[in-house]
């Protein structure tokens, strides 16, 4: 009895099919896909056979039965003698092996795939080497134009256009968004425009002198207008008709009298009849 019980698990193990290895399953799948491709190609080569036979009154060329081929992978193929041989000779080249596009950091020389400066400013610098407070500092568009004497065309139209990021104004939220540029790229672009640092400094000095001259000119104009306003007010006061206010009259001699204006000192002499 015990021997019979021990034989049952062994018989059950023999009845269960063994699982095929992964390589065998992959080979079977490739052969199945190839069989489907050959069948589709054969059908596409003669899509109008029934229609052509009906058009010729039922007369059609009768071909021999297709050749049956055992692929050895569990599939049976019906292969035309000439057409399938041509299709079978087609060799598909394997696709290229995709490799990661690594970028070399210009600071440390190490390879990296992604970084903040590379994504936003096309600067090959990894996040570990990023110096946000000094070398890789960001400046506003207004500061770039005032400090480095750049115009809008120098930033946006000169090749290559400089990249920037847009952020809300932290001081005035109701104002428009700020455009922030990489200071390192702004300095490089200013040297391209002005040629050298010395030429840039000379241009800044000339612009500062012109700005001071304009301020002095505006100041002189305001002083001139103020003087003109004062003179015109004095002239207007002088043109007003003066009304004399005479004091008591004085008797000079026979029937002659005199009185003096208390405001301007004008003397009026007259005779009483």
Curated annotation (Swiss-Prot):
UniProt-annotated location(s): Nucleus
Tissue: Expressed in various cell lines and in skin fibroblasts.
Provenance organism: Homo sapiens
Keywords: Acetylation, Disease variant, DNA damage, DNA repair, DNA-binding, Isopeptide bond, Metal-binding, Nucleus, Phosphoprotein, Ubl conjugation, Xeroderma pigmentosum, Zinc, Zinc-finger
Phenotype upon changing residue 108 to F: In XP-A; severe form
Covalent link location (Glycyl lysine isopeptide (Lys-Gly) (interchain with G-Cter in SUMO2)): 63, 86, 145
Function, in words: Involved in DNA nucleotide excision repair (NER). Initiates repair by binding to damaged sites with various affinities, depending on the photoproduct and the transcriptional state of the region. Required for UV-induced CHEK1 phosphorylation and the recruitment of CEP164 to cyclobutane pyrimidine dimmers (CPD), sites of DNA damage after UV irradiation. During NER stimulates the 5'-3' helicase activity of XPD/ERCC2 and the DNA translocase activity of XPB/ERCC3.
Residues the record lists as N-acetylalanine modifications: 2
Family statement drawn from the similarity comment of this UniProt entry: Belongs to the XPA family.
Zinc finger (unnamed): 105-129
Disease (UniProt): Xeroderma pigmentosum complementation group A: An autosomal recessive pigmentary skin disorder characterized by solar hypersensitivity of the skin, high predisposition for developing cancers on areas exposed to sunlight and, in some cases, neurological abnormalities. The skin develops marked freckling and other pigmentation abnormalities. XP-A patients show the most severe skin symptoms and progressive neurological disorders.
Main location per the UniProt record: nucleus
Chain span(s) of sequence motif Nuclear localization signal: 26-47
Subunit structure: Interacts with GPN1. Interacts with RPA1 and RPA2; the interaction is direct and associates XPA with the RPA complex. Interacts (via N-terminus) with CEP164 upon UV irradiation. Interacts with HERC2. During NER binds XPD/ERCC2 and XPB/ERCC3 of transcription factor IIH (TFIIH), bridging the 2 proteins.
Keyword rRNA-binding: no
NCBIfam families in UniProt: rad14
SUPFAM superfamilies: Glucocorticoid receptor-like (DNA-binding domain) (SSF57716), Putative DNA-binding domain (SSF46955)
Annotated GO MF terms: damaged DNA binding; protein domain specific binding; protein homodimerization activity; sequence-specific double-stranded DNA binding; zinc ion binding
InterPro entries: DNA-bd_dom_put_sf, XPA/RAD14, XPA_C, XPA_CS, XPA_sf, Znf_XPA_CS
PTM note: ATR-dependent phosphorylation of XPA at Ser-196 is important for cell survival in response to UV damage. Ubiquitinated by HERC2 leading to degradation by the proteasome.
GO terms under cellular component: cytosol; nuclear body; nucleoplasm; nucleotide-excision repair factor 1 complex; nucleus
Modified-residue entries (Phosphoserine), positions: 196
Any Gene Ontology biological process: base-excision repair
Chain residues that bind Zn(2+): 105, 108, 126, 129
Transmembrane listed as a keyword: no
Interaction with CEP164 and required for UV resistance: annotated span: 4-97
Name this polypeptide is given: DNA repair protein complementing XP-A cells
């Amino acid at each position: 009895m015990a021997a019979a019980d021990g034989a049952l698990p062994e018989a059950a193990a023999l009845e269960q099919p063994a699982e095929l290895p992964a390589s065998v399953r992959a080979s079977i799948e490739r052969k199945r896909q190839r069989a489907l491709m050959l069948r589709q190609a054969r059908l596409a080569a003669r899509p109008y056979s029934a229609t052509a036979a009906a058009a010729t009154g039922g007369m059609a060329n009768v071909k021999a039965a297709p050749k049956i081929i055992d692929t050895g992978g569990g599939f049976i193929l019906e292969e035309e003698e000439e057409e399938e041989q041509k299709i079978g000779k087609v060799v598909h080249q394997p696709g290229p092996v995709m490799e990661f596009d690594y970028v070399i950091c210009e600071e440390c020389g190490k390879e990296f795939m992604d970084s903040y400066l590379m994504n936003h400013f096309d600067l090959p610098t990894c996040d570990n080497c990023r110096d946000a407070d000094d070398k890789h500092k960001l400046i506003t568009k207004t500061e770039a134009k005032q400090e480095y004497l750049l115009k809008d065309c120098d930033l946006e139209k000169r090749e290559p256009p400089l990249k920037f990021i847009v952020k809300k104004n932290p001081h005035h939220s109701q104002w428009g968004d700020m455009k922030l540029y990489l200071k390192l790229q702004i300095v490089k672009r200013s040297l391209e425009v002005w040629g050298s640092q010395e030429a840039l400094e000379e241009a800044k000095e000339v612009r500062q002198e012109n700005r001071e001259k304009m301020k002095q000119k505006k100041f002189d104009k305001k002083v001139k207008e103020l003087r003109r306003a004062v003179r015109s007010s004095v002239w207007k006061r002088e043109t007003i008709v003066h009304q004399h206010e005479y004091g008591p009259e004085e008797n000079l001699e026979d029937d002659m009298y005199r009185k003096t204006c208390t405001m301007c000192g004008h003397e009026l002499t007259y005779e009483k009849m």
